[in-house]
Amino acid sequence: MSHVLAAVAWPYANGPRHIGHVSGFGVPSDVFARYMRMTGHDVLMVSGTDEHGTPIQVQADAEGVTPRELADRYNRVIVADLHGLGLSYDLFTRTTTRNHYAVVQELFEGMYRNGYIVPKTTMGAISPSTGRTLPDRYIEGTCPICGYESARGDQCDSCGNQLDPIDLRNPKSKINGETPEFIETEHFFLDLPALAGVLRQWLDTREGWRPNVLRFSKNLLDDLQPRAITRDLEWGVPIPLEGWRDRGDKRIYVWFDAVIGYLSASIEWARRSGDPEAWRRWWSADGQGKDAPGYYFMGKDNIVFHSVIWPALLAGYSGEGSRDGQPGELGRMNLPTEVVSSEFLTMEGRKFSSSRRVVIYVRDFLERYDADALRYFIAVAGPESNDTDFTWAEFLRRNNDELVAGWGNLVNRSISMAAKNFGAIPPVDPAGLTEADEALLAVARAGFGAVGELIGRHRQKQAIGEAMKVVAEANRYLSEQAPWKLKSEADRPRMGTILHVALQVVSDANTLLTPFLPHSAQKIHELLGGTGVHAPMPVVEEVEDLDGGPAYPVLTGDYSVGARWESVPLEVGRPLDPPKPVFRKLDPSIVDEELARLAG
């Protein structure tokens, strides 16, 4: 058993999350974490709500509330959404905890001591009409690199390059449309050029990454520039240096503090577990965690922060760049093993947009449909390696033709026939298994290797496809063997054998699909007469801040129980009851209903 870190991108707490968000960071990470636990690994899956930065401050000002009040509101909404989806976080926390502030400031101070954070005078944007600072994200213009006309002041979403507002052509304020003025201001910069060598060495060893992620990351190293990590802002983590700590107008930039959340969440989890040093088993590069792999899950717009910025912070804190230096009190820490990036999900051919009502929020989806229906769609048709379009017609088809008519039908008819004719798991005919019986059982057993290998390589579309092939083979077997035709007493042993084989394959297929469809997996486990926890679920707990701050909700859970990644022989004679359908067949009218909602 090894320790495995599953670090999941932090959803921003300025509103509810839509299904496009969870298709990138949520479901893929949970599938991976559940599979790794089922194979015996000690997984630590962490994340939380990202609660600092300009968008929250601007929105709070517009609503007449404090940034903390706004973050509190949406933190609870997001926690409820992710709980409803069954995402199995060991800890889902937030970036406004005092623990997080302390860890962020420790990394900042350590990098500053090592010379990888340096002060620099730069040009900052202000609003001519109000005199207030204009944050990068609220300035748009033409990208000087690719010509994209809606590039933000911090990043171009078209070419992916990081930018400064002053570099934009024809910059405009997104708040009121005016042209910003640029004035001198002092900030701290991350000296990325001094860390380029160690980053390149590390990326050269990442041969197993998705090609687009690795190629994009290496290209970023060709022209690395120092990057500002503080901002003229009132809402954020204070700068932990003499003369700066008490300044109300300067804060650490949100992208710097958010990626450190993976570490601070791990430390918080350890403190809450009663072993404050336990986090080192997943992080320490010199001790017991030196061989622990770390997998980072996100959408493609966050690649740069995980393949360049975060490794640079870890390397700089450890003193591993061209300036050398000494590790801080947290010690040397592991760089990411793999950055697992998903592409974008669109909706009915358009980009998700709350303002244009091109959106379906997770909470609204879960009010009308089952969580596993969405999880299935994301797994089988999500944006794993290409931008993918969510349409209600395709969602309906996948649900009714595959989930209900394929998997649900196999479960229902196998258990129904066994319950009706035997009332229990039937025995195998003493005469033995036929070639057809053996062949189907072999297909199911082979699925554990095939599906598991694909999940381990983050090929989840192929993985669930292999699992559904087992389902299709079992349905074909039942149709060919036709146990319902074996009505005589002499045929009863053969009927029992067919149904025993079918039920065994249902059990095996259920295990193969458990990482993808945990809610239904638990139900099917119970329909097969199983007891106890098959697919453990997260719980929402209200906790006190460990260092005296306000209380807040977290997602956590006990995932040490549950199924293992193996075929478990069914117990002959275990009672079976007539099953109720596991999946809901959806009426075709939902397509027009949902499209009407989009039209507003």
Curated annotation (Swiss-Prot):
The keyword DNA repair does not apply. Binds 1 zinc ion per subunit. GO terms for biological process: methionyl-tRNA aminoacylation. Its cofactor is Zn(2+). It is found in: Cytoplasm. Belongs to the class-I aminoacyl-tRNA synthetase family. MetG type 1 subfamily. This is Methionine--tRNA ligase. The gene is metG.
